[in-house]
Amino acid sequence: MDNLDEDDLAFFSKPIKKPPLNYAKQLIASSSDSEEESELDTNKQALEHINAQKNITHNENKSAEPLSRQSTILDADEGNQDVSDTTPNACLNEGRHSPKSAISCVTQPVSPVYNTRAAANLRNNSINSEAALSTTSSLLDDDFARRLEEIDRQVQEFEKSSSDMDVQIHTHKREIEEDDDNTSADVPLLKHSKSDHSTLYHSKSEFSTNEPVISVVLQLAVIGQRIPNSNISLPRDWEAPLFFKVKSNQQFRRVRIAYSERKKVDNVVLVFQNQRLWDYGTPKGAGMLKVDTRLVVHAYCHSDFISLKRIKELEVEKLSSVTEDSTAQTCKLITLLLRSSKSEDLRLSIPVDFTVKDLIKRYCTEVKISFHERIRLEFEGEWLDPNDQVQSTELEDEDQVSVVLD
C-alpha cells in the first residue's frame, strides 16, 4: 500500500510536459470562462497539498507509529466515512477555503484513498481539457478551411467577371473602330507598303480619335434639266431652283428625296460636274469642298439621264473616230527628198498610194519645169517603174531619191 501511495505521489510530483499552445489554443485558453479557471486553481492547490502531505507521511513512516498505520487502514476499509476526513475532501473538491483553513488541512492526517481520488480527479480534468482543446482546434481548422474555400470562390468569380468585362470592352472597341472606318471610307488613307505597318496604324489612328469632327455647311442650288426631243412630261417649275443647306458629312439621299417630294417626280438623278451623286455619297467625298461652299447641282429624270448618257457616249465615239481618221491619214503620208543635178533639192510629202509617175509630176510642178516621159527616178542604183505605187516600192520616210533629167 505504501508503494502504491508513493507511485501515485511520484506521478503527481513529476512535471507534466505539455506541448506549446498554438494560436488557436491560446485563443481558447484566453476565452475560457470563470468556472474552468476555478477548477485549474483547485487542481493546483490540491497538488501543493499532496506534496506537503507526502513529506509528513514520509516522516511518520520513519517514526514507525503503529497507531497511525492502523488508522490509515481503517479509513480505507470504512470508505472515507470518518468525519475528520470531510474537511480535506471539501478543501480539495471545492477549493474555497482560506489560507488559514489550508494550513489546518495540511496539519491533519490524510488517507491514501484521498490521494488516489485526487490523482484520478486531476487526471480526468487534464484529459477533458485536452479533449476540449483538440475538439475546438478541429472546429477552428474546419472554419478556417471553409473561409479559404470562400475566398477561393470569390477570387474565381472576380476573375470570371473581369474576363467577361474584357471581352465586352474589346467587342465595344471593335464596333467603334468599324464605325470609324465606315465614316472615313471617303477619306483616302496614306500610302503604305506591306512591310510598313506603322504608316497604316498612324493613318487609322488619325480617324479613330475622339476629337469632334467639324462639319462645313454648304449651300446647294438644285436646278432641273431638260434634254431635247424628250418625251417625259415634267412639271412647269421643273427648272426652278431649290436651295438646300447640307453638311459636308451628310448624305445626298436626303437632298434627292426632298427634291423629289417637292417637285413630285420620281427617280430623280443628281449630277455635279458631269458626275452622278449617289445616295450614300457626301459633299466631302464628292470633292465639293475643294471647289466652293455655294454650288450648283443639276437634276435629271432617270430616263432623261440615261438618254443624255447615251448621247454623250455617241459623241465620244464620233470624236474618237475622227481622231482615228486623221491619225490614219497622217500615217499614210510619206516624206521624200528629191535631188537633181540641175536644180535644188526638194522635200515632198505625198500619200503612199501615189504612183511614181504622180511623184514626178508633183516634182515638175514644184520646180516649174515641163513634164515629159524622159524624166526618171533612181533609188539605190535602181530605176523606179512609173506605174508602181510608192507603198509597193522600198521607199520609206525621209529617203533620198535621185531625179534624172534627159
From Swiss-Prot:
GO biological process: double-strand break repair via homologous recombination; replication fork processing
Compartmental location: Nucleus
Subunit architecture: Interacts with rfp1 and smc5.
Main location: nucleus
InterPro entries: Rad60/SUMO-like_dom, Ubiquitin-like_dom, Ubiquitin-like_domsf
SUPFAM superfamilies: Ubiquitin-like
UniProt keyword annotations, A-Z: DNA damage, DNA recombination, DNA repair, Nucleus, Phosphoprotein
Name of the protein described by the UniProt record: DNA repair protein rad60
PTM remark: Phosphorylated by cds1.
GO molecular function: SUMO ligase regulator activity
GO cellular component: nucleus
